[in-house]
Amino acid sequence: MSNKEKGANVERELYQIFIDNNWRAVRVAGSGMMENTACDLIAGKKGKKFCIEVKSSKKPYKYISKKQIEEFIIFSQIIGLKPILAVRFNREGWFFIKPEKLEDPGKNFSISLEQARKKGKRFSQAFS
């Protein structure tokens, strides 16, 4: 399975979690493939609207380019949504973290499983 297919699968998984919890969500067409599509999902519920960048990792950490995060934040601001990263670590489930809480070790931003446990939230905490 290609990285593109894996990414689409985790996006669909998260989309379904939103639907199962009475939120409305849409996957952004061309996410990760085209310019100006700097997020993967848009989700909302009365008075709450989020722009979501979806990441997954088999390893206990994930690196994300600074350019991608900067574009994601700008995109979120332009359309008036709160930016949040959704990171799924295999066998650990989903963590939701604000972009400003990412670690900045240099070239890329990073989030480790340990940091996600400390700084991130689970679905019910992030979207209550």
Regions found by a protein language model. Give the residues of each.
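Acidic-basic catalytic patches of nuclease active cores, encompassing PD-(D/E)XK
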Residues: M1-G30
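Short, charged, amphipathic alpha-helix that recurs within catalytic cores of restriction-modification
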Residues: K49, S57-R88
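Acidic-residue sensor for enzyme active/binding pockets
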Residues: E11, E53, Q68
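Conserved catalytic cores of phosphodiester-cleaving nucleases, focusing on short active-site segments
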Residues: F18, L41-K58
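Domain-level recognition of nuclease-like catalytic cores that cleave nucleotide substrates
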Residues: E5, N9, K82-S128
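Active-site metal-binding core of divalent-cation-utilizing nuclease and nuclease-like domains
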Residues: N21-K46
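Residues at secondary-structure transition points
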Residues: E5, N9, N36, Y63-K66
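Amphipathic alpha-helical interface surfaces
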Residues: L14, T37, Q68-E71
